[in-house]
Structures are given as structure tokens and as C-alpha cells.
């Protein structure tokens, strides 16, 4: 009898593991090993979640027993300044930034992922294509930076998100 109960428990454990859900976020800005580490750090506190960042593909694969945990992982990545497209419509990548869709002369951006010089270059390239942006103070490791010019705040975040980055307007 003990063997049967143990066998059933083992079968249920295997079945539960096989039922894990996997969602891939694509088009995420992951330019270096520090970005890969940043992904791991961002989701470290999400219990039951496994995250795998692929620098070459620009993807983050999230695996957990349920979509609630995966959603927490996606939310943690956004809070850390990463952005991408979800392979599962049930997992929403929060695009809210606080931008008001208004023309501004300056704006402070917080929590955009800036771990290295390549991240700063990516920000500069994005902002160079936003009409009206004339300057910024983005720097490696910065928690916030200023953008100046005469530009639409929402256009800035739309461009960041298209490039796999995000942040919040302060």
C-alpha cells in the first residue's frame, strides 16, 4: 500500500511539473551579460518563477506553475526597465509610463534599464529619432535622467518600448 501511495504522489508531482506554463517576451533590450544579470535580479523575488534571458535573441522566457506567477515576473521586468511583447495574450506587459501625451520641454525618466554604455547608446539612438528631443543626461547606472527639447512625452515612451526598454515619467 505504501508503494502505491508513493507511486501516486510521484506521478502527481511529475504531472504538476509538466503542467508548468512558459511565456516568452520578445524584442527585449538585452545587449550584454549585465542585462542578462539585470533580468535575473529583476525577477529574483518572484517565488516559483524561472527566467531565462537570451541576449542573442532579445528574449526572456518565463516559466512557472501558473500565469499569476508569470504575470508577476513580467511586472517585475517592466519595473526594472525592460519591455517586450508577450507570446501569451493572458500575460500583459504593462505599457503605463505616466506620460500624458502632451508636448513638454523637459521630462525626468525613472527606472529605465541603463546597466552599461550600450544601454546608454540605445537610449541615445531612440531619442535621436523622437521629433523635438534635443538632449538627455542618460548615463550608465543612472536611476533617472532628464530629456530636453520640445517633444511629446508619450512619443518618447512609445519609442523606448519599441526598442525593448521602458521607464516611468517622474
How would you name each of these model-derived features?
Residues 9-18:
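Hydrophobic h-region of N-terminal signal peptides that target proteins for export
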Residues 2-6, 19-170:
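Flexible metal-binding regulatory segments at protein termini and peripheral loops
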